[in-house]
Regions:
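Short amphipathic alpha-helical surface micro-motifs
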Residues: 34, 50-52, 82
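Catalytic Zn2+-binding segment of zinc metalloproteases
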Residues: 84-102
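Active-site scaffold of zinc-dependent metalloenzymes
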Residues: 49-74
Length: 141
């Protein structure tokens, strides 16, 4: 009986967390649909328990809720660890994640591509990325 209660509580917590991150999950679903149309080979990297990691052909990575879309490159494992920090941010911020982290991060990345002078600064010093790194160092093994 006690085990059943623990299981029910776990499912309720997961449901609340899913709803808390609902905006990110909706955008992730749309982005996944786009990737299905654009990429031939999509799969799930099952080595990670903290999130659903979807490797694909792309530059960089994008984290939306519990979904990490990551480009396959030589820095893959390091990138995934960093992106798992973003999943923690999503759990903390919930519906504010896209405003506080997502939009500023993508904007900063785009500005760095448009203005080479910004590339002189370390990308991971930007507040969204620094916080993700700090969280991943603290909580992801």
């Amino acid at each position: 009986m006690f085990e059943m209660m623990k299981l029910i509580i776990k499912y309720i917590k997961n449901l609340i967390l899913f709803i808390w991150q609902l905006p990110q999950h909706i955008v992730a679903l749309i982005y996944f649909g786009y990737l299905v149309m654009m990429c031939k080979d999509l799969g799930i990297d099952s080595r990670y328990k903290q999130a659903i990691v979807i490797p694909c052909v792309m530059r960089g990575a994008v984290t939306l809720g519990n979904y990490v879309f990551a480009g396959l490159n030589s820095e893959y494992k390091k990138t995934i660890k960093h992106e798992l920090g973003h999943t923690i941010q999503s759990k903390i911020l919930g519906p504010l994640y896209l405003i506080v982290i997502g939009i500023p991060s993508i904007t900063y990345c785009g500005l760095r591509r448009a203005f080479p002078s910004l590339r002189k600064k370390n990308y991971y010093n930007f507040y969204t990325e620094r916080w993700a790194n700090n969280l991943s160092e603290k909580y992801i093994k």
